[in-house]
């Protein structure tokens, strides 16, 4: 009796484990998610984690060099991607967007900086502009390096479709992040750069953009086709750059 009960319990445990492992697969199948979708989502997230790590590190190191101890105190003057990744914006949402065929987007943990600590050699607005432009510049540099790697692989005769796909995704992602973050909307980097560039008499423009910044960002995300149209220059630059490799 005990042996029969033990055997039944073991069989029941194996069945439960089997059902538990099959359930997520079944759920993804019902949602129309394929293995290709899952692979694309994972690749995008990995590329995003690296791109954001350099982006946020650039913000942190420039603020640190200007005299602000805040990024160093917060442990942000590092290239460790885990420090800069946001669990929701860098991992969860991009994966869900990729699996559900929604537009891929994401963000990292913003670097906190206090302009009052900046060196007095520049004013605080100029300091904020330098810190802000460092992030998109880091993305542009990553895109250039990635393009160079693609060219080297082609010249060396290395033909690996998987690696090429990943590098092209990383290249395109960095171009997109640079362009998007330079939009003159708060809280994006471009908003802080615009605040520095505007003469004092046009300060009300910056105030308006700061007040309605999140509303404008939501509109960009939610209005069908608007974000895609806005990113047309990115697609043109990407296609032009990739044609140069041929």
Predicted regions and their residues:
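Hydrophobic transmembrane alpha-helices and their immediate loop junctions
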Residues: 1-246
């Amino acid at each position: 009796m005990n042996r029969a009960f033990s055997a039944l319990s073991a069989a029941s445990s194996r069945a439960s484990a089997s059902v538990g492992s099959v359930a997520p697969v079944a759920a993804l199948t019902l949602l129309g998610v394929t293995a290709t979708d899952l692979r694309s989502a994972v690749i995008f997230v990995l590329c995003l984690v690296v791109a954001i790590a350099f982006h946020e590190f650039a913000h942190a190191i420039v603020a640190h060099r200007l005299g602000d101890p805040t990024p160093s105190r917060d442990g942000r003057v590092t290239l460790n991607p885990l420090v800069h990744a946001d669990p929701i914006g860098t991992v969860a949402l991009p994966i869900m967007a990729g699996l559900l065929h929604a537009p891929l987007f994401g963000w990292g943990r913003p670097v906190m900086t206090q302009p009052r600590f900046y060196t007095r050699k520049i004013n605080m607005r100029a300091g904020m502009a330098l810190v802000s432009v460092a992030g998109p510049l880091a993305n542009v540099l990553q895109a250039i390096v990635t393009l160079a790697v693609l060219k080297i692989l082609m010249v060396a005769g290395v033909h690996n479709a998987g690696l090429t796909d990943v590098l092209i995704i990383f290249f395109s992602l960095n171009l997109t992040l640079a362009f998007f973050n330079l939009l003159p909307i708060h809280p994006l980097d471009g908003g802080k750069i615009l605040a520095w560039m505007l003469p004092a008499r046009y300060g009300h423009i910056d105030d308006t953009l700061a007040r309605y910044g999140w509303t404008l960002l939501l509109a960009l995300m939610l209005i069908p086709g608007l974000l895609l149209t806005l990113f047309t220059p990115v697609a043109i630059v990407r296609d032009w750059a990739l044609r140069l490799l041929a």
